[in-house]
Amino acid sequence: MIDYSIFYTRPIEYTKISENLPNFDIFISAFNDSERVKTLFESITSTKKFWLVHPEYHFSNEEIPSAEVNEVIIPSDITDISQVNELLSRIGDLSDKNICIDITGFMRHVLIFLVASLKYNGVDKFTAIYSEPKFYSDGDNTNFSTTTSSIVKSISGISATSNSEFKDHLIINIGYDHKMLSQIASYKDGATYHPVFSFPSLSADMYQQSSMRAALSGSITQNSDWITKRKFSPANNPFATAQVISDLVKELDLNFNGKNNIYLAPLSTKAQTLGFAIYWVLEGRDRGITILLPECLSYSRETSQGLKRLWSYEVELKV
């Protein structure tokens, strides 16, 4: 059993980024219109810097950063495997490299597959950075995924064969995307739901806002599981999130003699999405757990205002 509390996390003063963080060999960030993302990219000291331009943001060629100074990767399609493979192919050798990833602007499915791919490629550790906004632009009306298809699917390679005789359990991280929440719940209709709410939230009003948005998702909020089985994890702490998932899975396997099909659906902050990825890499893969997400066709380029604070997470992939 892994104790995720031993993983190291610390706040970073955003006016002293270069002083508080070491020099890196490789820095990766997903380009969008957020000043949080652009400020960090400019402030980080790294031998090589890579912009990953997600197709879901639909940037024109004129809007994409110049490739004269830093590497710019423009994947050919939206699949997680294509985006990550094109990124890693451009980066090249990862051995003995000090790697930093700004997870703030990443699409969830790509972030999860990237963490799994780093593990597969022998990377033992990396630093992840997450920047908190002061507030979301439209409060409880903020839209993140602007267009999704009708497809819900597992992350590439992050799935297990289900047993029709076992009980389905869906551990779902609750965020602002009520449409995605509704899609996931409908896809696993009949499963036992285990909602994980982001609390403490990034700010005092965000928990209430996400709860109000989740209420729009339909029948899942009328299910008794919504109240009786809810859990909480801090919105800005991936390791605490991984611990909540780990403890819950162990509890379910103990109660049902391991006869469970377990599905994870990270729909909240990128810090918590990282926590889902860390759990899967260190425990969920061997347990046979599937991570599900609705297919996102377009995503809002900027949903927030201001930079509240930065967090640095030392992610260990070999424990």
Tell what function each PLM region has:
Residues M1-N98, F106-V319:
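Long, low-complexity, Lys/Arg-enriched
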